[in-house]
Amino acid sequence: MERNTPDPEPSERAVLLYGLQRTGSNYTRQLLLQNFQHLCFCNQGYSRCLPTHKHFRLYDEKSAIPDVRFYNNFRYSSFQDFREHAGEIAGRGINIFIIVVKDPYSWYLSYKRHARKNKYPYFKGSLNAHYLIDYNLFYRKWLDFSMEAPEEVILLRYEDLIEDLDASLGRICEKFSLQRSSGALENPSKVNMNREFTRARSAYYKEKKYLELISERDRHVMQHLLDPELISGLNYQIIR
């Protein structure tokens, strides 16, 4: 099995980062690498079906996985079982799990574009309910794990990074006792193939302009499809 994860130095902290596609996982990884010392991300170089991949579908309802490239048959009875299996594959113990979350409405619009581009199962002209079911299940499992192991798992909202980056980094630093890099706070404006993060894009999230792009019909369906307990647990709101 190919591994691209470098062997960590003794002082490094091993991290696994997760999030659905289009939640800002690449941005978050780069942000943390630029602002904290001695982090080793252990997600690199693994197949999508393995629990060390950043988009791994952890949930038990495997038939709900919307794309065959992410199919897997791994089920875990507890966070400890998952952590041990992921650590076995990564080749070392891991006790920092960072989960990137995005508002389901802005995420859905972005993921829909991403799905068309990457030829995921997609229905034109109607709400792609299977994406929202994937969202519910993906983050429900991680929310449960965060309550089971609050000292090891943190759910990090993409919008909080945009709204108050310093406070968000401070929360991560305090939770995991990380060491901040010297110098001014760094915020990458562009990562890999993503578009540059401009003031207009910042306003798009801060002012929730994405809601204007969702039809009344689709909002009505999303209202009934999104898991209200999950959305509340992530500190978002269902639009009614």
Would you name each region that the model predicts?
Residues 1-183, 214, 218-219, 224-226, 233-236:
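PAPS-dependent sulfotransferase catalytic domain
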Residues 37-40, 93, 116-119, 160-162, ...:
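Glycine-centered secondary-structure boundary/capping sites
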Residues 53-58, 185-240:
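PAPS-dependent sulfotransferase catalytic core
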Residues 41-44, 177-189:
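Short, surface-exposed acidic
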Residues 15, 153-154, 206:
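Short, functionally important structural connectors and interaction interfaces within domains
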